[in-house]
Amino acid sequence: MDFTGDLADDLLFLKSMDIDMVGMGPYLEHRDTPLWRYREALPSQQERLRLGLHMVSCLRLLMPDINIAATTALQAIDPEGREKALEIGANVIMPNITPLGNRGNYRLYENKPGMDEGAEESTRRLMESVKRSGCEIQLDTWGDSLHFQNRVKK
């Protein structure tokens, strides 16, 4: 299957909506959804990872001043998926601070990373991985995108 045209249209749609932030990642099937029975028709997870990273890099070129999240869906396929996204265009990464007792209620896909880590451990590991990727975490800094800041000044 070739999704190139659809994905390009998605990027152009995001630009036309004048958005300030995007969180996107590869589609990950879940057994409790109607699409589960068609999972064999999906591209391989490695291909979905490649496409997801490609979308992040293309969106960064198309919209250089928005915030783009490095999502856990990328990490579900590749343990370094979020770091790879940071290296090619993402500029936002979020720790999982949901209390452990509630995490089971938020299973968007199989193999969601960090389901057994507490908020402190999740944040610590996240900070270490961001540092390894060569990026710098901006703590205690307002996170509005430059796009948003410029838009509200008008």
Where would I find each of the regions flagged by the language model?
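Canonical radical SAM enzyme core domain
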Residues: 1-9
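Auxiliary Fe-S-binding modules of radical SAM enzymes
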Residues: 15-154
